[in-house]
Regions:
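An amphipathic, basic-hydrophobic helix/alpha-beta surface used to engage anionic
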Residues: 2-156, 187, 197-202, 207-208, ...
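Short, electropositive alpha-helical surface patch
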Residues: 155-168, 259, 304-307
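Von Willebrand factor
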Residues: 161-196, 208, 229-230
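C-terminal functional segments of enzyme domains
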Residues: 185-193, 197-201, 208, 226, ...
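A short, acidic, amphipathic alpha-helical segment used as a generic capping/interface helix at domain edges
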Residues: 211-212, 271-278
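SAM-dependent methyltransferase
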Residues: 235-271
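Conserved, well-ordered alpha-helix/loop/beta-strand core segments that scaffold catalytic motifs
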Residues: 275-308
């Protein structure tokens, strides 16, 4: 925690000339610092922070008593209770420690499409959520999903390390080939050793999208899925005879875009989103529809708070 003062002082260096594409002003950063990513269960951490841990010892929050046993630390004895009951009791505390915040960014080829660009939107959302975690003195682990793997960046701690997160995000480019999101999610889950909030930012354009949800739910983390779609995907401005090409495989299909076709598309899209939300709810995953037109402030301070992904 000794670095906090330096971290806060250095925030003024987050200027457009130095950081692209994720730039936050002082006011936005201060608002982010008042938030915390929610975890509903006690977790094991490796270093003291402000999260609740299942470890017992002398710390900030008293939780219970138990009978003294030979070898217990005598400093934990409650002598006031002994004076009243003439029995030796050990005071139990819950230590508050850090957790690891896992932020997964889908960088498949389809994420580079849309206006605004879905990948750019995802980077900004990832940076904001990373800062929330860093401001809580949690460890933040960033990973990019491409191909069949999850490429992890070194985990960081402390608000001063937001610069490293921004640099990592700025260096991420969209894949030029096909991405198997379910396989990449499974790859990340297999490497995961510390539980905590886990956020996936993705358009979920994958034939096995439901498996992606299942793979991440299996980590027993507090999983949130930010389903990121562009306006053109939600309401395509198409008309006439067209050839629609898959951005990842290059496969194409000829269509005639008329009112009937577009209505059918919107209906199928709504059914797909509803199905993903249903599967997510069943697996205790927070499903958050996230159009790229949604302002970042509204996403973080309204939508994610409403869905209990973050709290003040």
């Amino acid at each position: 925690m000794a670095e906090v003062g330096t971290d806060r002082q250095s925030r003024r260096d987050l200027l457009p000339s130095k950081v692209d594409p994720t730039v936050f002003d002082e006011s936005f950063l201060r608002q982010l610092e008042r938030l915390q990513l929610i975890t509903r269960t006690a977790v094991h951490g490796g270093m003291k922070g402000i999260r609740r841990s299942v470890k017992r010892g002398q710390s900030v929050e008293f939780t219970d008593y138990r009978d003294y046993a030979l070898g217990d630390d005598l400093r934990a004895l409650d002598w006031n209770v002994y004076a009243r009951l003439e029995r030796l009791f050990i005071k139990l505390f819950i230590e508050e420690e850090d957790v690891t915040v896992h932020i997964l960014l889908d960088a498949s080829a389809s994420m580079a499409t849309g206006s605004p660009d879905k990948l750019l939107f995802g980077k900004r959302a990832a940076a904001a959520l990373a800062y929330v975690g860093l401001a809580s003195y949690d460890r933040v682990s960033l990973a990019v999903l491409q191909g069949r793997v999850a490429r992890r960046f070194p985990a960081v701690r402390g608000t001063g390390r937001i610069f490293q997160v921004l640099a990592d995000l700025s260096g991420i480019g969209a894949s030029t080939g096909a991405t198997d999101l379910a396989a990449a999610a499974r790859h990340y889950a297999a490497q995961l050793t510390q539980r905590g909030p886990l956020i996936l930012i993705s358009d979920l354009f994958d034939p096995n999208a439901e498996r992606v949800v299942s793979e991440l739910a299996g980590t027993r983390c507090e999983v949130a899925l930010l389903h990121t779609l562009s306006p053109d995907e939600l309401d395509p401005p198409l008309e006439g005879d067209l050839r629609v090409v898959d951005s990842e495989t290059g496969d194409g299909v000829d269509i005639t875009a008329d009112l009937y076709t577009l209505d059918a598309y919107r209906q199928r899209l709504a059914e797909w989103q509803a199905r993903l939300e249903q599967v997510s709810t069943k697996r205790r995953v927070s499903y958050v529809p996230t159009p790229t037109t949604l302002p970042l402030t509204e996403l973080v301070f309204a939508e994610l708070r409403r869905r209990r992904v973050v709290a003040a």
